[in-house]
Amino acid sequence: MAFQGPSRTLTQQSSAASSDDLQKILFSPDAIKKMATECDLGRHHWMRADNAISVRPLVPQVTSNNLLPFFKSGYDAGELRSKGYMSVPQVLCAVTRTVSTDAEGSLKIYLADLGDKELSPIDGQCVTLHNHELPALISFQPTYDCPMELVGNRHRCFAVVVERHGYIGYGGTTASVCSNWQAQFSSKNNNYTHAAAGKTLVLPYNRLAEHSKPSAVARLLKSQLNNVSSSRYLLPNVALNQNASGHESEILKESPPIAIGSPSASRNNSFRSQVVNGL
């Protein structure tokens, strides 16, 4: 969660004391922990048979409980223009399957408003993914800011709803959904251009490609051997007579092999490859 833009930044419309209070409400360690545990922000949510429908609000209830009196007191005191709005520019979800591709099933993922009893998709922000299509990335963009209010006994805010369909015979986890978003809070609101929900199918990760390439150890050995070979053909640092072609050919001539254990071999240890751990 973050505040962006001077016209939408609540901290510039209230006193420093209220700004500190707001920072504590939104960014304290406890608030961040609640965002993860209650809303699954940035965490993997497993879709199981015993949890076929998942409703995840984008704001924890404890945060809403703290924000409502903050906005109300500022509004009643004439410091704020409204009782507060929640704005979410975009919600991104990464979806992967955890069963075989031939499993018959699908996921319906959409953005809803908890102020709606039916929890219908807002502005057509709904995507259906069949099991064989996964993995995939999906995105949602609401067209309005949600008022921070109570509807009955429910705190109104946006929520990500995931429905699991099919997967007969699969009682365990069939898919994993990891959602990320950035909630903003302001005393001003707006409407936004409609954008259809996005669905991008992702190619599965080809981990076999890593094994088809030379390993790091093999590349290191190869580079060392190349350095050894090149060092044995370096010309000595002496002046050469351009007209003495016969003398040059003798210098460039490769020396005969040196027997292991001979005195000459000990003087040429610089040409031997180093030992790499693990080989």
Swiss-Prot record:
It is found in: Host cell junction, Host plasmodesma. Its main location: host cell. The keyword tRNA-binding does not apply. Residues 267-279 have a biased composition (Polar residues). Transports viral genome to neighboring plant cells directly through plasmosdesmata, without any budding. The movement protein allows efficient cell to cell propagation, by bypassing the host cell wall barrier. Acts by forming a tubular structure at the host plasmodesmata, enlarging it enough to allow free passage of virion capsids. One of its GO terms (biological process) is transport of virus in host, cell to cell. GO terms for cellular component: host cell plasmodesma. It comes from the Viruses. This is Movement protein. Keywords: Host cell junction, Transport, Viral movement protein. Transmembrane segments: none annotated. Signal peptide: none annotated. InterPro entries: MPV (IPR000603). Belongs to the cucumovirus movement protein family. Residues 256-279 are annotated as: Disordered. The keyword Transport applies. Residues 256-266 have a biased composition (Low complexity).
